[in-house]
């Protein structure tokens, strides 16, 4: 399980570093967007520069995962990003849902060895 978790951590870090840095460097061409809510959402994210904040919270934790430092913090920072990726694909682009599910699986595999770091968050009472 330790090897699987390490591989998952590196893959998760690589995925978020690659796609997060694409927002800053634009090395992947964007396909034309279909009309409708997905287009409006993507245009709003781009024109408001909100996407740069999201990209930062992809790249910074990705680097932490790849260098194996502050791994629980990196995983905690990626959790809301992953939830939003899943919600986006469930509601607007179901074709990308398998990739989103893969990211969720990688996240859970990476969390497993450091789950004790999150134990305090799951206490019913203080």
Residue ranges of each PLM-predicted region?
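Solvent-exposed, well-ordered loop and adjacent helix/strand elements within mature globular domains
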Residues: 18-54
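Extended, low-polarity transmembrane helix blocks
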Residues: 1-27, 52, 67-126
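Core segments of transmembrane alpha-helices
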Residues: 55-60
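Conserved interaction-surface patches within small, structured recognition/assembly domains
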Residues: 61-67
């Amino acid at each position: 399980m330790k090897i699987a978790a390490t591989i998952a951590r590196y893959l998760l870090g690589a995925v978020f570093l690659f796609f997060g840095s694409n927002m800053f460097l634009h090395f992947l061409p964007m396909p034309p967007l279909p009309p409708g809510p997905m287009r409006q959402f993507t245009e709003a994210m781009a024109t408001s520069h909100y996407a740069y904040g999201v990209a930062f919270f992809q790249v910074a934790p990705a680097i932490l995962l790849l260098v194996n430092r502050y791994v629980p913090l990196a995983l905690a920072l990626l959790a809301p990003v992953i939830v939003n990726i899943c919600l986006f694909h469930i509601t607007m682009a179901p074709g990308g849902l398998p990739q989103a599910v893969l990211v969720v699986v990688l996240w859970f595999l990476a969390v497993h060895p450091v789950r004790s770091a999150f134990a305090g968050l799951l206490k019913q009472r203080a």
